[in-house]
Amino acid sequence: PIIYKGNLLDDLFNIASVVWLMVALAAILTLTIIYFITLGEMKDAQKLKDNIYISDKVKTPAVYGIIKPKIILPTEYDANKLNFILMHEKAHIKRKDNFIRLLTLIVVCFHWFNPFTWLMLKLLYSDIELACDESVLSKCDEAERKEYAYTLLSTAEKTNLFVASFGGCKIRIRVEKNLYYKKNFHLI
């Protein structure tokens, strides 16, 4: 009689399933730890007004939180750039970008093995920043657009996974889109 080694395929599937689950759980655990560390750092932030806070723990302006989002500014920020920064961060809040970021991070945790998932994450984060830039630019004249581009350049820093940040995305792309921005005209 012929004996098939069908158990080998079952064993490989079981091993792959366990590896997938362990990596997914490790990723979720890592993100949870990062989230609580970030949350702890934000407890020391001082309230300026409404949902705007200042903290020495952040390097660039950012929005923290999903249910009650807070705009966190670094202690050393330029008051001349504050209007642009607040417009940008308020666009993140209005668009619920932190919720979208959280959902995409969860997707990446479960699809960590797929390189297209990582590409999607990178492109989505870039698009989020560009959409907020466009929201700000739609309210600016040409001189203000140049000032906004300068503001982007001066606040460029690495950002946190969980926050929508003014300094996120590739700054060169954002500045170029900023300088060549054309307002959309609607006929209706």
Predicted regions and their residues:
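Membrane-embedded and juxtamembrane structural elements of multi-pass membrane proteins
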Residues: P1-I188
